[in-house]
Amino acid sequence: MTTVPTTQRAVVVGPEDGSVVVAESIPLPDIEPDAVLVQVSAVALNPVDTKMMPGFLNPGNVLGLDFAGTVVAVGPAQPAWRSLQVGDRVFGCTDGCDSRRPRVGAFTQFTACRGSILIKMPDHMSFATAASMGNAIFSSGFALFHSLQLPGSLTATAEKSHWVLIYGGATATGTMALQFLRRAGHKPIAVCSAKHFDMAREYGAVAAFDYHSESHVQEIRDLTKNALSFAFDCVTTQSSVLACEEAMGRLGGRYTALDPFDPTLVSRKAVKLDWILTLTLMGRGSVWPKPFGCEPDEALLTWGTKLAEVAEGVLAEGDHVLKAHPMRIMEGGLDAIPSGIDAIRQGQVRGFKLVYLL
């Protein structure tokens, strides 16, 4: 049985703007009634980890979303269907990165998380693979089946198959979204660099287009016969927003982004706009600065809980039912994470995800 210490090492927001440091001794997070304490075995980096600086978090706040590990303590108010026990291997996103709960984050030796939004790992899955999948699963499910309101699901094929544009098809969320769409019976189109075409097709794209090409929008319109009505933008730059709008068919449709964007960029009233903040699936809302701030929403927690339950069942079907994004397992544990965050900021991480074993 694991002995749980009272303090731990963690990667935290540093005292200077934009800095990330390793704290040698901070208290463990409290375990709320519906939460579990997890001994972290692996973590993965996401672009959002580069943004959690003053204004979002305060100096000393723990960083990190994606993790995998082993349950070492369980709160008394777990939902009946979840029934997590000490010793269970789990993964997911922390419901941390929140100045209201400064000791909760993934980049620690022990983290706390609501049990209902954790996913039990199948026996065949490694901690490294599991750590790389949490944010991608929740972001893809949230965008495709909640925001875009696509028919079908991970376990049910839609009666009508739709073209769906994934802008950023070679990102970690993009490759997961491609797989979700194929399972739901849709026809995903990836936009990425030409060097990642094979990867996009391997993850489920029926076609791939190079965003460097001036003709890629027209090529998408030609392929879809001017009938594209769904777009998920995993990049969210001015050029990606405009490209997604222009690729939409004459009747318009729905556009969802991973980040906030300027809605005045889109002139077509027939295109319904949205963006998602995946952490709201944890039910706590957000105290990040505008436009991220929002009130707690129990309905989103219920939806996120159901997604975790469904994803857990799908992963239990066998190895490679849902494939993780290509990853690089890095040496150095927590001490190496600050340099990994710098690498993402400098644009050195493309087409793969950085994973650290602890």
From Swiss-Prot:
Protein task: Trans-enoyl reductase; part of the gene cluster that mediates the biosynthesis of cordypyrones A and B, 2 pyrones that show modest activities against pathogenic bacteria including methicillin-resistant Staphylococcus aureus (MRSA), Mycobacterium tuberculosis and Bacillus cereus. The HR-PKS milA catalyzes the formation of cordypyrones A via condensation of one acetate with 10 malonate units. Since milA lacks an enoyl reductase domain, the 2 beta-keto processing domains DH and KR of milA collaborate with the trans-enoyl reductase milB to catalyze the different levels of reduction.
EC supergroup of this enzyme: oxidoreductase
Subunit structure: Monomer.
Pathway the protein contributes to: Secondary metabolite biosynthesis
Catalyses which reaction(s): 10 malonyl-CoA + acetyl-CoA + 3 AH2 + 8 NADPH + 18 H(+) = cordypyrone A + 3 A + 10 CO2 + 8 NADP(+) + 11 CoA + 8 H2O
Family designation: Belongs to the zinc-containing alcohol dehydrogenase family.
Listed EC numbers: 1.-.-.-
SMART domains: PKS_ER
Annotated residues for binding of NADP(+): 48-51, 170-173, 193-196, 211, 258-259, 349-350
Molecular function terms from GO: nucleotide binding; oxidoreductase activity, acting on NAD(P)H
Alphabetically ordered keywords of this record: NADP, Nucleotide-binding, Oxidoreductase
Origin species: Cordyceps militaris (strain CM01) (Caterpillar fungus)
Protein name: Trans-enoyl reductase milB
